[in-house]
């Protein structure tokens, strides 16, 4: 089975070349200096990797999946795909800044799973999103065991987790017991096999659908998120993805979403995040000085929720007048504090809890930065990420 059961296996994997080191440098991108407690993305900052040209493109309010090979995504490299033979992990990292007055600050490494571009910022009602299930791969079914086997891997089906909502299509006739235009939920058997359930609860319980024949033609599974596919641990951020600042307004910002238990009609809690007026490029809109409506970088979830499977509505309560923003679905990998100018912050993730964060194939890795004090524009950050797989 992929993964590491001992330190000896980690050492063996590294000796066998099953590792990757990436050096990076990114510039702080906003057109105005940050104030303390603000968070910004480094997506569009110059450096290595270069600035993205993705997050202010595409159709309004439509989900767009992001992978490390997505055109113009400009993500951190992590060694390419290794599944299902191996599992990849982030083993260690360091980061540093030599830019004056930047430290102390905090860097957060995140996997951006996908995003919704919002250009209709003058609309003040909750706007419905489009969530087309665009990830797809083919499968065959065994009527004797009810087990389905992946027969293509273009969209990395080894990433699919138990409880993921899917739909099916076919060029012929689906296996008996299954239908098109119907929601099913995955029971993951292995990285190459799965079963299907009629509900999320049945998927978690392992109660599969009885398949009584293999059907005819080519069968296809479609799903939404390319990683963390059931939404567990997935969070959201609102950020200015454009070079132009947003307009002069301070709207409440809220989401309607489906949670990772596949429960619909979930909502941002009552004390809503408040967007900054004239928010500059790369700003996570509701971060900044303390007070009502100011939060850490993720949007708060409804009580009891553990993640977002899809966003169904997006709302700014008053007109943002001009500009645009994006809402991204992200999974935090780790954080590293930078306490002192010129002194690297280091993380040995083998010995932390939880240790060895998993890096899924296709991961779109980026940095966010949380300012501890006023941060000048074009401030540089640099460092190194170390990955190992086995």
Where are the regions a protein language model picked out?
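Short, hydrophobic/proline-enriched secondary-structure or compact coil segments at domain edges
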Residues: 40-43, 90-93, 234-239, 308-319, ...
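Small/polar beta-strand repeat architecture
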Residues: 132-224, 246-248, 257-356
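Extended low-complexity, serine/threonine- and proline-enriched intrinsically disordered segments
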Residues: 251-263, 382-387
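Autoprocessing Asn-cyclization modules and mimics
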Residues: 2-180, 187-194, 200-203, 222-252, ...
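C-terminal interaction-tip segments
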Residues: 2-35, 323-390
